[in-house]
Protein backbone atom coordinates (compact mmCIF):
# COMPACT_ATOMS: atom_id res chain seq x y z
CA UNK A 1 0.00 0.00 0.00
CA UNK A 2 1.34 3.40 -0.94
CA UNK A 3 2.09 5.58 2.07
CA UNK A 4 1.17 9.24 2.26
CA UNK A 5 4.25 10.34 4.19
CA UNK A 6 7.33 11.21 2.12
CA UNK A 7 10.81 10.74 3.58
CA UNK A 8 13.76 12.96 2.69
CA UNK A 9 16.82 11.51 4.41
CA UNK A 10 20.48 12.41 4.85
CA UNK A 11 23.21 9.80 4.46
CA UNK A 12 26.32 10.38 6.60
CA UNK A 13 25.78 9.53 10.27
CA UNK A 14 22.09 9.07 9.48
CA UNK A 15 22.41 5.80 7.51
CA UNK A 16 26.17 5.47 6.93
CA UNK A 17 28.62 5.55 9.84
CA UNK A 18 31.08 8.26 8.77
CA UNK A 19 33.74 6.87 11.13
CA UNK A 20 34.00 3.77 8.89
CA UNK A 21 34.60 5.68 5.66
CA UNK A 22 37.67 4.83 3.60
CA UNK A 23 38.51 7.38 0.91
CA UNK A 24 40.67 7.17 -2.18
CA UNK A 25 43.38 9.68 -3.09
CA UNK A 26 40.71 12.03 -4.53
CA UNK A 27 38.63 12.07 -1.35
CA UNK A 28 35.91 9.82 -2.76
CA UNK A 29 34.46 7.32 -0.30
CA UNK A 30 35.18 3.80 -1.56
CA UNK A 31 33.97 1.93 1.54
CA UNK A 32 31.72 2.64 4.49
CA UNK A 33 29.46 0.66 6.80
CA UNK A 34 25.93 1.38 7.88
CA UNK A 35 24.99 2.44 11.40
CA UNK A 36 23.68 -0.45 13.50
CA UNK A 37 19.99 -0.78 12.67
CA UNK A 38 20.07 1.58 9.67
CA UNK A 39 19.99 -1.12 6.98
CA UNK A 40 16.90 -2.72 8.52
CA UNK A 41 15.28 0.69 9.03
CA UNK A 42 15.81 1.72 5.40
CA UNK A 43 14.73 -1.57 3.85
CA UNK A 44 11.66 -1.78 6.09
CA UNK A 45 10.54 1.73 5.10
CA UNK A 46 11.15 0.88 1.44
CA UNK A 47 9.30 -2.45 1.68
CA UNK A 48 6.37 -0.73 3.39
CA UNK A 49 5.97 1.54 0.37
CA UNK A 50 7.35 4.86 1.54
CA UNK A 51 8.83 7.24 -1.02
CA UNK A 52 12.41 7.76 0.18
CA UNK A 53 14.59 10.49 -1.31
CA UNK A 54 18.22 11.00 -0.35
CA UNK A 55 19.07 14.66 0.32
CA UNK A 56 22.77 14.71 1.18
CA UNK A 57 25.94 16.76 0.99
CA UNK A 58 28.93 15.13 -0.69
CA UNK A 59 30.20 13.66 -3.93
CA UNK A 60 27.89 11.65 -6.17
CA UNK A 61 30.46 8.88 -6.70
CA UNK A 62 30.88 8.44 -2.93
CA UNK A 63 27.15 7.74 -2.54
CA UNK A 64 27.12 5.43 -5.56
CA UNK A 65 30.03 3.42 -4.10
CA UNK A 66 28.64 3.18 -0.58
CA UNK A 67 25.07 2.25 -1.47
CA UNK A 68 26.17 -0.25 -4.14
CA UNK A 69 28.49 -1.88 -1.60
CA UNK A 70 25.77 -2.05 1.04
CA UNK A 71 23.05 -3.11 -1.40
CA UNK A 72 20.74 -0.25 -0.44
CA UNK A 73 20.74 1.97 -3.52
CA UNK A 74 17.37 0.65 -4.68
CA UNK A 75 15.69 2.05 -1.55
CA UNK A 76 15.95 5.63 -2.82
CA UNK A 77 13.49 6.83 -5.45
CA UNK A 78 15.76 9.82 -6.07
CA UNK A 79 19.04 11.29 -4.87
CA UNK A 80 19.68 15.00 -4.39
CA UNK A 81 23.41 15.49 -3.88
CA UNK A 82 25.15 18.79 -3.16
CA UNK A 83 27.92 18.17 -5.70
CA UNK A 84 25.29 18.12 -8.47
CA UNK A 85 23.06 20.89 -7.08
CA UNK A 86 26.04 23.17 -6.45
CA UNK A 87 25.04 24.08 -2.90
CA UNK A 88 24.89 22.29 0.45
CA UNK A 89 22.10 22.08 3.00
CA UNK A 90 20.52 24.12 4.48
CA UNK A 91 20.21 25.69 1.00
CA UNK A 92 16.65 25.83 -0.31
CA UNK A 93 18.03 24.61 -3.66
CA UNK A 94 18.69 21.17 -2.17
CA UNK A 95 15.08 20.78 -1.08
CA UNK A 96 13.73 22.33 -4.30
CA UNK A 97 15.72 19.73 -6.26
CA UNK A 98 14.30 16.84 -4.21
CA UNK A 99 10.79 18.22 -4.67
CA UNK A 100 11.25 18.59 -8.43
CA UNK A 101 12.74 15.12 -8.87
CA UNK A 102 9.77 13.59 -7.06
CA UNK A 103 7.12 15.73 -8.80
CA UNK A 104 6.04 17.24 -5.49
CA UNK A 105 4.19 20.51 -5.03
CA UNK A 106 3.96 23.13 -2.30
CA UNK A 107 0.84 21.30 -1.08
CA UNK A 108 2.92 18.13 -0.52
CA UNK A 109 5.21 19.83 2.02
CA UNK A 110 2.88 18.89 4.89
CA UNK A 111 3.53 15.21 4.01
CA UNK A 112 7.34 15.45 3.98
CA UNK A 113 9.80 14.72 6.77
CA UNK A 114 13.55 15.37 6.66
CA UNK A 115 15.66 12.97 8.70
CA UNK A 116 19.22 14.01 9.46
CA UNK A 117 21.99 14.30 12.02
CA UNK A 118 22.98 17.95 11.76
CA UNK A 119 20.98 20.79 13.34
CA UNK A 120 22.83 23.41 11.26
CA UNK A 121 22.17 21.68 7.93
CA UNK A 122 19.38 19.08 7.95
CA UNK A 123 17.17 20.50 10.69
CA UNK A 124 17.68 24.18 9.84
CA UNK A 125 17.09 23.46 6.14
CA UNK A 126 13.92 21.46 6.80
CA UNK A 127 12.51 24.02 9.22
CA UNK A 128 13.22 26.94 6.87
CA UNK A 129 11.67 24.98 4.00
CA UNK A 130 8.50 24.27 5.95
CA UNK A 131 8.78 20.50 6.29
CA UNK A 132 8.88 18.33 9.41
CA UNK A 133 12.38 17.83 10.86
CA UNK A 134 13.65 14.70 12.61
CA UNK A 135 17.08 14.70 14.26
CA UNK A 136 18.94 11.43 14.75
CA UNK A 137 21.43 12.29 17.48
CA UNK A 138 23.43 9.08 17.99
CA UNK A 139 26.72 10.44 16.63
CA UNK A 140 29.11 12.48 18.79
CA UNK A 141 30.68 14.09 15.68
CA UNK A 142 28.35 17.08 15.57
CA UNK A 143 27.04 19.52 18.15
CA UNK A 144 23.39 18.55 18.58
CA UNK A 145 22.49 21.64 20.59
CA UNK A 146 20.43 24.12 18.57
CA UNK A 147 21.81 27.67 18.64
CA UNK A 148 18.67 29.23 17.17
CA UNK A 149 14.94 28.46 17.18
CA UNK A 150 15.19 27.41 13.53
CA UNK A 151 17.65 24.64 14.51
CA UNK A 152 15.22 22.99 16.95
CA UNK A 153 13.95 19.71 15.48
CA UNK A 154 10.28 18.73 15.51
CA UNK A 155 11.30 15.24 16.69
CA UNK A 156 14.47 13.63 18.07
CA UNK A 157 15.42 9.97 17.79
CA UNK A 158 18.54 8.35 19.20
CA UNK A 159 19.03 5.37 16.88
CA UNK A 160 17.75 4.28 13.45
CA UNK A 161 15.18 1.76 14.70
CA UNK A 162 13.35 4.54 16.54
CA UNK A 163 12.49 6.08 13.18
CA UNK A 164 10.10 3.26 12.17
CA UNK A 165 7.40 3.80 14.83
CA UNK A 166 7.67 7.58 14.47
CA UNK A 167 7.19 7.38 10.69
CA UNK A 168 4.20 5.05 11.14
CA UNK A 169 2.67 7.47 13.65
CA UNK A 170 3.22 10.48 11.39
CA UNK A 171 1.87 8.60 8.37
CA UNK A 172 -1.23 7.52 10.32
CA UNK A 173 -1.91 11.16 11.17
CA UNK A 174 -2.18 11.86 7.43
CA UNK A 175 -4.64 9.03 6.70
Go through the PLM ranges and name each one.
Residues 24-28:
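Conserved phosphoryl-transfer catalytic core
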Residues 1-20, 31-46, 50-175:
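Asp-based, Mg2+/Mn2+-dependent phosphohydrolase catalytic module
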Amino acid sequence: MEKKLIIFIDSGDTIIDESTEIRDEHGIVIHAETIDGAENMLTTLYNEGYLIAMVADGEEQSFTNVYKENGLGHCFKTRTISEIVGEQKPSKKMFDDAMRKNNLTEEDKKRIVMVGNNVKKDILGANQYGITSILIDWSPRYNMNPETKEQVPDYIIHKPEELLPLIEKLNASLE
